[in-house]
Regions:
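Intrinsically disordered, low-complexity terminal tails of fungal membrane proteins
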Residues: 1, 58, 284-306
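Beta-strand-rich luminal/extracellular ectodomains of secretory-pathway glycoproteins
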Residues: 1-115
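Transmembrane alpha-helices of multi-pass eukaryotic membrane proteins
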Residues: 3-12, 179-186, 207-217, 256-266
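Helix-to-loop junction signature of class
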Residues: 22-29, 226-246
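Transmembrane-helix exit/juxtamembrane "anchor" motif
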Residues: 27-28, 233, 274-293
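Membrane-proximal, non-transmembrane alpha-helical segments
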Residues: 121-189
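Juxtamembrane interface at the cytosolic side of transmembrane helices
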Residues: 177, 184-230, 279-284, 288
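Short, membrane-exposed interhelical loops at transmembrane-helix boundaries
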Residues: 242-258
Length: 306
């Protein structure tokens, strides 16, 4: 047994577990919910327009007038009831969740507990979509449906929902699918690296075993590196675009920092395993080159020819 093979074995297992957790984060209610890729905050949806409408009540085409046409006196009651706590109750009065989180396999939604303005508020998950590769959920359709059955029975059109947000969310859905595929590849090669490390543990650092393990770890590293880069760039850029577009109606988005951390750590761990195997290959090659070569006479003598 070659106990030094435990090093790449542990590294490969670490990358496998971290990648697996990142892939399945949020796939059911309450499971690693805070490891989302992007989270949308809807707790202030319509809040800015509410202020604008209150200040410009003389405008017959104001947002408040349109809401009143749809919900009659419902929104007026909301203004009186909510008062200074509008940030805590507006989403509830509209009939939507306060946040929506995008994971690699689904979309979850819920409320901030105990409320959105509380320090260190935690995420109370109320529902998640069915897990599938790259959730590809139409958030506009989901919100419109929730608003239509809410207390005020309004629509996104009444809230001046910008069409550009859906275009941005479509891009986010595409890079979520790309990340999903890359993580599946990374998990697969990390698993093969585990098996290869076990082979090295029992069989020794043979040339074929070393090269095979190096190939497995390099391919896993490439997949996880690409996934981490797409996550970091795509999530941050997607959140930035949503913030720019949705600021006027109170929508904000945030890239998942915890997901990025676990993603980069998984890459770093499997990359360390790849470095180990290339170092092991170099050491083995140097040892073979320094080994004394027997002469033809010595070989014949060992075979009993003399």
């Amino acid at each position: 047994m070659h106990f030094t093979a435990i090093v790449p074995l542990v590294l490969s297992m670490g990358a496998f577990v971290l990648s697996f957790l990142a892939l399945f984060a949020g796939h059911k209610e309450g499971f690693m919910e805070d490891y989302d890729v992007v989270r949308l905050n809807m707790s202030r949806l319509g809040y800015n327009l509410l202020n604008t409408s209150s200040d410009g009540s003389s405008d017959s085409d104001s947002w408040l007038d349109r809401i009143t046409d749809v919900a009659r006196d419902g929104f007026s009651d909301l203004i009186n009831d909510v008062g200074n706590d509008v940030a805590d109750r507006l989403a509830d009065e509209l009939g939507i969740s306060e946040w929506y989180s995008l994971h690699l396999m689904d979309v979850c939604q819920g409320d901030f507990a105990p409320n959105v303005t509380a320090p260190n508020a935690w995420l109370n998950v109320t529902e998640c979509t069915q897990p599938r590769p790259g959730p590809n959920v139409n958030l506009t359709e989901m919100l419109d449906q929730e608003l239509s059955i809410g207390p005020l029975r309004v629509s996104l059109a009444d809230l001046s929902w910008p069409d550009d947000i859906e275009g941005t969310l479509d891009k986010v859905n595409k890079f979520l699918l790309a990340i999903f595929i890359l993580y599946v590849i990374g998990i697969g090669f990390s698993g093969l690296s585990i098996l290869g490390s076990l082979a090295a543990f029992f069989l020794g650092f043979r040339k074929l075993v070393t090269i095979t393990n190096f190939v497995f770890t390099v391919l896993a590293s490439i997949a996880l590196l690409a996934g981490s880069l797409i996550t970091t760039i795509g999530a941050k850029e997607g959140a930035k675009q949503i913030n720019d577009i949705g600021d006027d109606i109170g929508i904000s988005a945030e890239a998942g920092q915890k997901f990025m951390i676990i993603s980069w750590v998984a890459f770093a761990v499997i990359a360390a395993a790849a470095v180990y195997w290339i170092a092991q290959f170099c050491v083995g090659r140097r040892s073979r080159s320094r080994a004394p070569r027997r002469t033809y006479t010595e070989k014949r003598h060992k075979q009993g020819s003399f």
